[in-house]
Amino acid sequence: MNNRSSVLQVGNTSYTYYPVSAIEGHEKLPYSLTVLLENILRLAPNDEHAAKLADRLVQAGLSGEVGSEIEFSPARVLFQDFTGIPVFVDFAIMREACIELGGDPKNINPQVPCDLVIDHSVIADEAGCADALKNNMALEFGRNKERYEFLKWAQESFKNVRIVPPGVGICHQLNIERFAQVVMTREEDEKKVAYFDTLVGTDSHTPTANGIGVLGWGVGGIEAEAAALGQPITTLVPRVIGVKLTGKLSEEVSAMDVSLTFAQMLREEGVVGCFVECFGEGLNSLSATQRACISNMTPEYGSTCTLFPVDEKTLDYLRLTGRSEEHIALVEAYAKAQGFWNDPDSTQRVYSKVLEIDLSSVTRSVAGPSRPHDRIDVTRAKQAFDRICSERKLDTEKTVEVNILGETQELSHGALAIAAVTSCTTATDASMMLAAGVLARNAQAAGLHPKPWVKTILAPGSRATEDILDAAGLMPALRDLGFYTCGFGCMSCIGNSGPILPFMHEIANDIELASILSGNRNFEGRISPDVSQNYLCSPALVIAYSLVGTMDFDFETQPMGVREDGTEVFLRDIWPNASEVKELLDECCTKEVFDRAGEGLFEGDEAWRSLGKEASDVFAWDPESTYVRRAPYFDGMTKKPEAPKAIENARVLLNVGDFITTDHISPAGSIASDSPAARYLEDHGVTVQDFNTYGARRGNHEVMMRGAFANVKLTNKLAEGKKGGWTKDFLDGEIKAVYDAAKHYQEQQIPLVVLAGKMYGSGSSRDWAAKGPMLQGVRAVFAESFERIHRSNLIGMGILPLQFEEGENVQSLGLDGSEVITIASIDFSRGLPDPSVVDVVATKQDGSKVSFKAIVRIDTPTEGAYFYNGGILQYVLRSLS
């Protein structure tokens, strides 16, 4: 493998690159493994190591099975502010710890480009009015000034860091519009080196970039920290599922409908931990942004990525969004040289399994009421709603009266409290947003208007999206229906919906209210604590549902309203014409629009520019701060790690069921006034109206550890029927807040464990879903299965992930959570756990014992090294000190 590099001539420029063609069998690898192979060839420290890792990858890839451990070093890291601020807080703490261990604090600095976009903090406090955007931005800045000052310090004090100020857009949309290069270049030894653009991000929807041919995925903040500091990510060579796309979409169907179809099909298939990539002649009918919409939904079916190869559609998008012709020529030449150019057939590529989706069979869809993969055909949405009510034992005849502007209205289960056109999932694709605007214009012409109990929210993913709607002349119709832009950020998609209308809040416990949004997540309790049912769909359908004000509606048979002439209006009468949308797209979605939207990307408004923080090696902590505090992760840390010991006489903190999401474990939304976190804030002089959200408080471990397992919708079997963040304290027999019980156990030096079912840790790449439990004293989590990112996060924080053996679970073992649990010691000194299946003894209250074995889900030697060190940050800190 001597001379791993070669020269690629593009026009008058010569590029050094690392051809995968040097490796036998490369042409049969899936596209995604080709990217990993190039990464190995380029970054391995010597030929021997490169040959070893390349052989592992190729052997696994050609077998279609999971392979051995390889290393992956992403070209860059993407952050959003909720998960990014804790990262830079950790860096600040690590700098201090580095000094204490005798090292240079400047060693704690990102080694690769890092972009942080402030998109998670804006809340739809106001909506449906002309001043909503201005007022929400002012409120956002007022609440978050302290956090933003910290980010200004981070930008000045760390190299390789760029921060996009608030009010610009969503990180994933800006990533494909502005940051992603598809092929990157750098100067090295007076040569220009070309290589695949790759990334990891601290948001689970990072795979959005897969749609334009950029391999990347979501990781927890702690894993992203290590990657930013130059630590390779280790992973087993994954199984790769090929999705063959055939046919083309019918005119009324959107990319969101395809995304929901993917989520349903692939979650049923079971692709957790797999790579997914798309091929087939159906790709030719999908634009780059439609592909990005599909890729955005990746975490909702559990795969690591959903990659599309590069083709002319990719180049068209790069051209549209302002990349130079020289760079576009490089992308084309490099993709073709590396076998990454779209081959519609791809029959020679080896996949673990091939699934097929006929795009012409996709129908208009919604998904809900609490899982993105529970797809429903719109024509059967009314029947599905009736079934959901029956399953929940809801009286569909029940009504409640509300007074709206002097008129009495009767509402029943399924009444819409929120209709939100929001999220990078759909705003990325201009055709979907234009379709929503056309439907709004048609509805306006027919005399239709959203019901007065619906809070209407429009949150474009970037300034370009609003500019396109404006250029098409559709913003006036949207505003007339109450869809005023109220923020350029994630908003409802992450639960920043703000308060629902007061009279709706008053009846939230009497009937099950619903929300409808064009986002990617609808988990229980996520969109609003007052809303019990959440549904996902395309932007046009969001507006359509706002016009009828309920999920209890059949668009096929029920009229949405009556025109002035007495004729009935059905959805089919106002649905956008595909040819008109295409004309508007061609006319209004232009390079000039994207160029204007990209001007001053990093400058911010006057409020942002006025923030002043000088660079310094260490951060000056404010002891009075309730937003940014020094966490105790490294207190008492020694240069050499202590070997992990057996976990003896542990108590069960929670006993939960299937599909416990990271939202359940560490909520991002509002802080309940009766919660331990609220008590802490009030004790520190913070009034209820200034609580902000858990997500905004992630720089303060005191708030976040009190917020662990505090989701108001959490069901814990130990809480004796009490819903929310409650558990039983077996030391005194009381039902109390989870944090209060955990604190009591910690005072008695009693370790804690969690019992769970399938898919534990699904959802967001939330490192606080591991940090919070760790600070509460949780040492291990037992589950039937773990979602990929959360399992990594647990290891990264020194929590042991233990999986029940096949056919066993909490119920089959007869566990109820009252047991005292002992887990035998495990040796990690050689990397992989020894034993890989550990003995566990659960002692019941009557003294009887249940003995069983659990699989230690520490899958690679590197993960073992992290756990041996007490966590990934401790490992990295020791290596840099």
Name every feature range the model reports, one short phrase each.
Residues R563-A578, R791-Y866:
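Acidic, glycine-rich flexible loop/linker segments
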Residues E614-D690:
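Segments forming glycine/polar-rich beta-alpha architectures that bind adenosine-containing cofactors
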Residues F279-L286, N520, K743, E747-E787:
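Extracellular/luminal Protease-associated
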Residues E188-A335, W341, M432, A440-P452, ...:
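Mobile "lid/hinge" segments at catalytic clefts and subdomain interfaces of large enzymes
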